[in-house]
Amino acid sequence: MADGQPFVIWVVFDVKPEAFDRFYEAALDDSTGSVRDEPGCLQFDVLAPTAGGNKFAFYEVYKSRDAFVAHMEMPHFKRFAAVADVALNDKNVSEYYRLQGAAK
């Protein structure tokens, strides 16, 4: 089923309050760099809850799992990972294959 299907990462981050701004800047840098510099990155959304708080979510879509693995070697990801290492209370990562997508 996975052959030829886009690879999706869904990550929810619980950010330490004192690291919120730094994490936010690093998240935007990673998202922008991923879409701009990686042909295998199809979409990278940075989300915040409507009720506020210190949570973020990433919705990332790659052409393949290999494209995601390549993403983790990019300079913008390494900068983000360095910030996340000290900015997070917790994170939850889920991996999916996109079976169908629709957008307007």
Model-derived features: positions:
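Glycine-rich beta-strand-turn "strand-cap" elements at beta-sheet edges
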Residues: 1-7, 45-54, 81-104
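Active-site-flanking beta-strand signature of metal-NTP-handling nucleotidyl enzymes
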Residues: 7-14
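Short, surface-exposed ligand-recognition loops at beta-strand->loop->(often short) alpha-helix junctions
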Residues: 14-24
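Short coil/turn motifs at secondary-structure junctions
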Residues: 16-18, 49-51, 63-65
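Generic recognition of short, well-ordered alpha-helical segments
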Residues: 22-26, 57, 72
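An amphipathic, aromatic/His-enriched active-site/gating alpha helix that lines ligand/cofactor pockets
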Residues: 28-41, 61-95
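Short, glycine- and small/hydrophobic-rich beta-strand elements in well-ordered beta-sheets
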Residues: 32-56
